[in-house]
């Protein structure tokens, strides 16, 4: 295997330097060339080492042995006794020995810093550390394995070897007595009645209190000026509900730790769409301005078709549509019913220009990075599950079917619908390609995420509980694509890069379905509604059985051969189809590619499957200030492969995501990056290109001069290489 980015030699002179230089100063040297004009990767290795010597070791509580430590952590209510009671003490100690025998070392200073500031168990006063990474990994494994010793051992191997990384809420909370939920992303529908609105605000409070980010659907709310009790011009539209939600998230701020996070989605053909977008304008009136809620817009195919022909675009009264069709506005296919609704005199309409709509969208994205975009028809064509997908989540990668709830006057449930929770974790593509057993790595990840679903019980929001219990939905993500491609001498977005992405996701999909089918066979059950899905009919498998999927380039064929990873054949898919049709799959949804933030640094990965934003990334980390992070596997000899996202451009990013999208049942967080010379026309071109390529959702729009959240993207030395 090629050397990692941290394999640069540490010389005697750097050892002398380390005795008198603190870890923060050493890390900062990443942003300075050495005398030969090289990036000083060795200084970051030293910084990580010094972080332990100067800080971690001095602030870690000492125990004489494992028994003393475990007894203390249980007795003092740090660890959940119920988790450990599922195993013998000897097994728990053997698992810890297994983890420590791996001799794990953080590859970067930022990875170590992130772990100790954000994840590890600390004393109740927050001043001292009670765990090392090995302890955290074992507690995650013991929690998720729920008494299965074999699975616990496999989980320790997969996590500590860096192949599988649970998402933040799972990695942070598992096994702790004082903890949040292991899942932290939720989607709710709001229906067009006061009971649903009130209950949704309460649900947002409950979920935010538990550390959750919540996305809510506003498309069904009657528009501004619609009738209430047959009296015209009474409705206030969606803006006051957005204000209520913004205040709710601000109030439920997780014990003051951080602001609650919320997003709202509205359909492009809802009459309030311009009002909705105007809430994010910098010069918006304070009465309507929305500062902290994220915005998403749902755009159907018809909107693009109208813009292509430079035609008018009609917005339809959501109030009238629900009365004519007897289903909520969001459950109607606007593309399918557009001309029918246009001709229906019972439905009020507002006329705008389709191209003007896209222009306003691009202007706002330039100004604020919002809104997210969901391509409604693309999403629903690819959906193998019965029902309609109406909106996405805070990171635009969760795409699941939801159903409305009905409420009594006292806000109790007359009928509990299905809302959505996201159980996430990601594979490190580079480490997974290096796995001694690719199929096992994928299966263990699926079993871990299924355990998160099985162990999550959000009883305060019955529709979330119902959705989780019925669907067992999970979202296996991926990260470190750019890092892996660069390590192997492939440019991101090149023919070989896109070819690898296609075959990798194709192969993962096969093993994901096989794992979920195995769980269904073991448990003798499958997700609710399986029999009405494209999995049960076999239709889902047609594209894999009717054509051959194999590498188009010699390089990618060679990578899979050297890794001894067998690429599934048409016959493999035929056998899998027979198994699934006969026995089902346990999980309604299986894959979703989130943006991956902090866990990427701990795992030393490039974020998600998008390109790096900088060769050496600058982050602002609380009181410590600027911290520098080198791209994985980068050395002074392979810098040419580390073009940043702004240099690569939107087409290659979209091509890469399109290759992955065709094998992912949910979505992928796709941020578009533009140089500061870009215009709104460039943004519109990118949106059209994404739509044509079958992309499902778009996340943020980033201009080079805009800072990524929590970072500074500026002209640092390493960016100019």
Swiss-Prot record:
UniProt-annotated catalytic positions:
393, 395, 397
- Which gene is this protein's source? nrdE
Q: Where is this site: Important for electron transfer?
A: 699-700
Q: Where is this site: Interacts with thioredoxin/glutaredoxin?
A: 716, 719
Task: Tell me the Pfam families matching this sequence.
Answer: Ribonuc_red_lgC, Ribonuc_red_lgN, RNR_N
| Annotated site residue numbers, Important for hydrogen atom transfer | 185, 422
BP terms from Gene Ontology? deoxyribonucleotide biosynthetic process
The species this protein belongs to is Mycobacterium leprae (strain TN)
Lineage start? Bacteria, Bacillati, Actinomycetota, Actinomycetes, Mycobacteriales
- What's the name of the protein? Ribonucleoside-diphosphate reductase subunit alpha
How is this protein annotated for GO cellular component?
ribonucleoside-diphosphate reductase complex
């Amino acid at each position: 295997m090629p050397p990692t980015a941290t394999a640069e030699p540490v010389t005697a002179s750097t050892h002398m330097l380390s005795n008198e230089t603190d870890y923060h100063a050493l890390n900062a040297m990443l942003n300075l060339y050495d005398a030969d004009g090289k990036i000083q990767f060795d200084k970051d290795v030293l910084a990580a080492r010094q972080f332990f010597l100067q800080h971690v070791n001095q602030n870690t509580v000492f125990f004489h042995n494992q028994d003393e430590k475990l007894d203390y952590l249980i007795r003092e209510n740090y660890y959940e006794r119920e988790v450990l009671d599922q195993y013998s003490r000897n097994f728990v100690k053997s698992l810890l020995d297994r983890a420590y025998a791996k001799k794990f070392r953080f590859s970067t200073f930022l990875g170590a810093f992130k772990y100790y500031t954000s994840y590890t168990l600390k004393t109740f006063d927050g001043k001292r550390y009670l765990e090392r990474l090995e302890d955290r990994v074992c507690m995650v494994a013991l929690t998720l394995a729920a008494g299965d010793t074999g699975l616990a051992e496999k989980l320790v191997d997969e996590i500590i070897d860096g192949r599988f990384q649970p998402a933040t809420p799972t990695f942070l909370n598992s096994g702790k007595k004082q903890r949040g939920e292991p899942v932290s992303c939720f989607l709710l529908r709001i229906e067009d009645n006061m009971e649903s609105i009130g209950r949704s605000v309460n649900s947002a409070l409950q979920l935010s209190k538990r550390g959750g980010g919540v996305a809510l659907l506003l498309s069904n709310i009657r528009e501004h000026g619609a009738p209430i009790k047959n009296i015209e011009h009474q409705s206030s539209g969606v803006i006051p509900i957005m204000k209520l939600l913004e205040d709710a998230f601000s109030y439920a701020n997780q014990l003051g730790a951080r602001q609650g996070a919320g997003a709202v989605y509205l359909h492009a053909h809802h009459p309030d769409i311009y009002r909705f977008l105007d809430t994010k304008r910098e010069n918006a009136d304070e009465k309507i301005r929305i500062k902290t809620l994220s915005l998403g817009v749902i755009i159907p195919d018809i909107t693009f078709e109208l813009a292509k022909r430079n035609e008018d675009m009609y917005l339809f009264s959501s109030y009238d549509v629900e009365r004519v069709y007897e289903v909520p506005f969001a459950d109607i296919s606007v593309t399918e019913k557009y001309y029918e609704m246009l001709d229906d005199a019972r439905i009020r309409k507002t006329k705008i220009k389709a191209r003007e709509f896209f222009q306003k969208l691009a202007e706002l994205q330039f100004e604020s990075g919002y809104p997210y975009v969901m391509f409604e028809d693309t999403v629903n064509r690819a959906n193998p599950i019965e029902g309609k997908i109406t909106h996405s989540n805070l990171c635009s990668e969760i795409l699941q079917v939801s159903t409305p709830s009905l409420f009594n006057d006292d806000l109790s449930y007359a009928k509990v619908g299905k809302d959505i929770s996201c159980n996430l974790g990601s594979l490190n593509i580079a480490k997974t390609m290096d796995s001694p057993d690719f199929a096992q790595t994928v299966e263990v990840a699926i079993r871990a995420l299924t355990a998160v679903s099985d162990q999550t019980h959000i009883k305060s929001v019955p529709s979330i509980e119902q959705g989780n219990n019925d669907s067992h939905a999970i979202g296996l993500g991926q990260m470190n694509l750019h890092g892996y491609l660069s390590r192997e001498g492939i440019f991101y977005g090149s023919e070989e890069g896109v070819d690898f992405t296609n075959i990798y996701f194709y192969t993962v999909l096969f093993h994901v379905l096989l794992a979920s089918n195995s769980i269904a066979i073991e448990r003798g059950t499958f997700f609710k509604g399986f029999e009405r899905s494209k999995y049960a009919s076999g239709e889902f498998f047609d594209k894999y059985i009717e054509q051959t999927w194999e590498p188009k380039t010699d390089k990618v064929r060679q990578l899979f051969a050297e890794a001894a990873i067998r690429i599934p054949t048409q016959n493999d898919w035929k056998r899998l189809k027979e198994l699934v049709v006969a026995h089902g799959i346990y999980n309604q949804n299986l894959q979703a590619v989130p943006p991956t933030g902090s866990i990427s640094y701990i795992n030393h990965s490039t974020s998600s499957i998008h390109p790096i934003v900088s060769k050496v990334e600058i982050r602002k980390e609380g009181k410590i200030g600027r911290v520098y992070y080198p791209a994985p596997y980068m050395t002074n000899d392979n810098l040419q492969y580390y073009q940043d996202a702004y240099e690569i451009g939107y087409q290659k990013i979209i091509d890469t995501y399109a290759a992955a999208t065709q094998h992912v049942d949910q979505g992928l967080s796709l941020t578009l990056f533009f140089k500061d010379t870009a215009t709104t026309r460039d943004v519109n071109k990118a949106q059209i290109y994404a739509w044509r390529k079958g992309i499902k959702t778009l996340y943020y729009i980033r201009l080079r001069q805009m800072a990524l959240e929590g970072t500074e993207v500026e002209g640092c030395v390493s960016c100019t290489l």
